[in-house]
Regions:
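Periplasmic c-type cytochrome electron-transfer domains
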Residues: 2-14, 18-448
Length: 448
C-alpha cells in the first residue's frame, strides 16, 4: 500500500504541474499559456523571415537605389541602348548584341505568346527596339528602364542582379529562369559601361580623359569588374594586365564573415559599399578607412568615406537584402558533372594530405572568424591585397564552385583550371600530391 500511495502522489504532482503550466522538468507544458505565447512569437519570427526574403528578393532583382541619376542622367547609357533611330545615339543595342555582352533575359517576365515567338525565331533580335521592349517588361536581368507617358526610354538604372544573377538558358542561350546569386561570368560590365555617350563624370573623378576611361573599361573583359578603381585609380597591374577581378558569387554566404576577394568587410558592409560607391545609388555610407589619401587617393578626394544623401534610398533596404542573400544556398552540382568515386577519394585528401581543410573549414569551406591571409601565406603577389584596407586575401568559400569555373580561379582568374590551383598549392607547400591525387581532389571540389 505504501508504494501505491507513493505512485499516486507522484501522479498528483504530475497533474498539478500540467494544470499549473509546467512539466516536471521546469519547462512550459505543451498547451500552457506561456507556450502559446512563445508559439505566437515563433510565428512572428517565421512571418518576419518570409517577409525579409520576399522584400530582399525584390530589392536584389529590381531596386536601383536611385542610381539611374548616374547611369541614365549622367552617363546617358539609355541613349546608347535606344540608338539614333529611337532618338538616342549610335546604332543602338540589339538583343543579339546585349546577349553577346552577357546580359540575360528573364523568361518568366515574358508574356507566353512572346516567349513562344522567341522560341520559334519570330522575334527580331537584331533590332534595338526589341531591347527597349524587353526593358519595358523588366525582363532584362539587372537593368531597369524608366519611361515617360509616351513610352519613350528616359533613363536607366542597374541592380545587384546585373552581376550576381544569371539564367538557366531554358528558352535559349541567355534567356531563361533566374539563378540569383550566381556570378555572371559572361557579363562584360566594362564594355557595357563604355557604350555610354558621356563618361565625363568618371573621367573627372579619375583625372583623365574619356577615351582613357573607355580603354580601361574595355580592358576588363567578360566576368570582371574593378571595384577598387574609383578608390585608388589603379587601372592596371604592374605587369600591364587589367586590375579588374572576377565577379564572385553571392550564394552560400550564411556563416561567412568577410566578403569579396580581399575581405573589405562583411556581406552587408559590401552591399552598402557597392550600392553607394559602385552602383552610385543615393544612400548613406561611412568608412573612415577611405579617407587615407595614400592608399585611396580618389576616394579620399571625393569624400567617399562619409556619404550622406537625403532622401536615403539604400539604408532601409540593407537588412532585407542581406537576409535574402544569406538565404540563397550554394547550388548542388549535377550528378554527371563529377566522378563520385574519385570525389570520395578527394575528400580524404582534402582533409588529410593536402591540408585544404585547415583554411577551407567544412561545412563553411572558409575559416570561421577573420578569414584573411597575407599574399606570402598563399604564394601569390600582393597587388590586389594591397588595394584593400587590411592588405590581405580572403579564404574564398568553395561550395558551388562548379557554377563559376568560367574565367578561371583566384581573384583575377590567373589559374585557368582547378587542377592549376591544386598544382600551385602542391608546389608552394610541398604537399607531394601525385597526379591521381590531384585529379581526385579536383573531382571533390567539383562535387561541393
Amino acid at each position: 500500500m505504501k508504494g501505491y500511495w507513493i505512485r499516486m502522489g507522484a501522479f498528483a504532482v504530475l497533474i498539478a504541474s500540467v494544470i499549473g503550466g509546467y512539466s516536471l522538468y521546469g519547462a512550459p507544458a505543451p498547451d500552457s499559456l506561456e507556450t502559446r505565447r512563445l508559439s505566437q512569437f515563433d510565428q512572428a519570427i517565421i512571418t518576419n523571415a518570409r517577409q525579409l526574403v520576399d522584400d530582399g528578393r525584390q530589392i536584389f532583382r529590381f531596386d536601383t537605389f536611385g542610381d539611374e541619376s548616374f547611369w541614365g542622367d549622367a552617363l546617358q547609357l539609355h541613349q546608347a541602348i535606344k540608338g539614333a533611330k529611337l532618338g538616342g545615339v549610335g546604332p543602338g543595342l540589339s538583343p543579339t548584341a546585349a546577349l553577346g555582352l552577357g546580359l540575360k533575359v528573364d523568361v518568366d517576365l515574358l508574356p507566353s505568346d512572346l516567349a513562344n515567338q522567341v522560341r520559334a525565331g519570330k522575334v527580331d533580335l537584331d533590332d534595338p527596339a526589341t531591347t527597349v521592349a524587353l526593358l519595358k517588361l523588366k525582363a532584362v536581368v539587372g537593368l531597369t528602364g524608366f519611361f515617360d507617358n509616351a513610352g519613350d526610354l528616359q533613363s536607366i538604372g542597374i541592380q545587384c542582379a546585373l552581376c550576381h544573377s544569371t539564367v538557366d538558358d531554358s528558352l535559349a542561350p541567355g534567356i531563361g529562369r533566374r539563378l540569383d546569386g550566381w556570378a555572371n561570368r559572361d557579363l562584360n560590365v566594362g564594355a557595357i559601361t563604355a557604350l555610354a555617350p558621356d563618361l565625363s563624370s568618371v573621367a573627372s573623378l579619375l583625372g583623365v580623359d574619356q577615351e582613357t576611361v573607355r580603354q580601361v573599361l574595355n580592358s576588363w573583359g567578360p566576368g570582371k569588374f574593378d571595384a577598387s578603381l574609383l578608390m585608388d585609380g589603379k587601372a592596371f597591374r604592374p605587369d600591364g594586365k587589367s586590375a579588374a577581378t572576377l565577379l564572385p558569387p553571392a550564394f552560400g554566404l550564411a556563416g561567412v564573415n568577410l566578403h569579396t576577394w580581399t575581405g573589405w568587410g562583411s556581406v552587408t558592409y559590401w552591399n552598402a559599399f557597392v550600392a553607394n560607391l559602385e552602383m552610385h545609388g543615393k544612400g548613406t555610407f561611412f568608412d573612415p578607412r577611405l579617407n587615407d589619401p595614400t592608399q585611396f587617393p580618389i576616394a579620399a578626394a571625393a569624400g567617399f568615406g562619409n556619404v550622406r544623401n537625403d532622401p536615403d534610398l539604400i539604408t532601409s533596404k540593407l537588412g532585407a537584402l542581406h537576409f535574402y542573400q544569406l538565404a540563397i544556398p550554394a547550388p548542388r552540382p549535377p550528378r554527371a558533372s563529377f566522378d563520385p568515386q574519385a570525389a570520395a577519394q578527394g575528400e580524404a585528401i582534402f582533409a588529410g594530405k593536402a591540408q585544404c581543410a585547415r583554411c577551407h573549414v567544412p561545412p563553411l569551406f572558409t575559416e570561421p572568424g577573420w578569414n584573411l591571409h597575407t599574399a606570402d601565406e598563399i604564394g601569390v603577389d600582393d597587388f590586389q591585397a594591397n588595394r584593400s584596407p587590411d592588405k590581405r586575401y580572403r579564404t574564398a568559400p568553395l561550395k558551388g564552385i562548379w557554377t563559376h569555373q568560367k574565367g578561371g580561379f583566384y581573384h583575377d582568374g590567373r589559374f585557368l583550371t582547378l587542377a592549376d590551383v591544386v598544382e600551385h598549392y602542391n608546389n608552394f607547400f610541398g604537399l607531394g600530391l601525385g597526379t591521381q591525387e590531384i585529379n581526385d581532389l579536383v573531382e571533390y571540389l567539383k562535387s561541393l
